[in-house]
Amino acid sequence: MRVGLIDVDSHNFPNLCLMKLSEYHTRRGDRVEWWDPAKQYDLVYKSRVFTDTYSKDTIQVNNADKVIQGGTGYGPGENLPHEIEHIRPDYFLYPRFLGTAYGFLSRGCPRNCGFCIVSGKEGRRSVRVADLSEFWNGEEEIKLMDPNLLACPDHERLIEQLIESRALVDFTQGLDIRLISRDNVSLLNKVRTKAVHFAWDNPDEDLTEYFRRFRELTSIKSDRNRRVYVLTNYGSTHEQDLYRVNTLRALGYDPYVMIYECPTAPRITRHLQRWVNNKRIFHSVSDFKDYAPMKKEV
């Protein structure tokens, strides 16, 4: 069987689903490759993480007996079969990322935030779904994709697995700052951490003291490795957005502005995102009102 794969997003991050499908079919003896419109396939998989706002699917497949599409970008759908979900990913599918392992130790989140699909898709409890050995086999770096690791009752044992690996770990999706404790930070301090991500999504919830406490307890020395997603254009005012950005910087964190439904965002929010996320500008222009595009509009 010839199997074609399509990464609809084509962004700078490997598609974990496609890597698992590639490994599964390769083990079955199937021929697996990136889809080529000039060839004929028995089966083609299209996978998309992002919705039309950020990643439009314009790819028409007319050269396959069967086409299966899936991923959060297409809306609710079936999960991967157990034997595929828990297979070690084929990291050779993305050669430029070799040396890095990608996966989930836990799934689900109790927060049920309106802008996030995780609670509806994975459940409102964070549960352990794998051990590290399922997707890591000595790679130098681990990209952990758990939506709310600290909400998982087994999170301490899972963190211990990361410690034992001695790999460089990037907590990519955001640890819950509200669940930080002296005990779990003590464990996190033993992880070889490349970066830790948090989120300050709700402007009506003042998380200042939580961030201050983590800063006092953590062994991560560089503010550029203590990163915080700041959600905007989801019921917040510009003043609330700017307050969170400035507060995080003052506390020793590196904010990163995320815009909900970017096409509907006001111009000032898009300017804020460019100012904050372009770190060369952010570190050289300390006040948003001094950012050049804003000065032109005053």
Where are these regions (language model features)?
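A short, structured N-terminal alpha-helical element that caps or precedes a catalytic domain
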Residues: M1-Q69, G75
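Canonical Radical SAM [4Fe-4S] cluster-binding loop centered on the CxxxCxxC motif
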Residues: L16-C17, R96-S133
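A general structural detector for well-ordered alpha-helical segments in enzyme core domains, enriched
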Residues: L21, K56-N63, L158, D183-L187, ...
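Anion (oxyanion) recognition and catalysis
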Residues: T26, I163, N246-A250
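A short helix->loop->beta-strand "cap" motif at the edges of active sites that frequently abuts
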Residues: N62-G70, S222-R224, Y253
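Ser/Thr/Gly-rich flexible loops in soluble cytosolic domains mediating phosphotransfer, phosphorylation
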Residues: D65-L93
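A structural motif corresponding to the C-terminal lobe/cap of the Radical SAM core domain
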Residues: K190, A195-H197, D204-V298
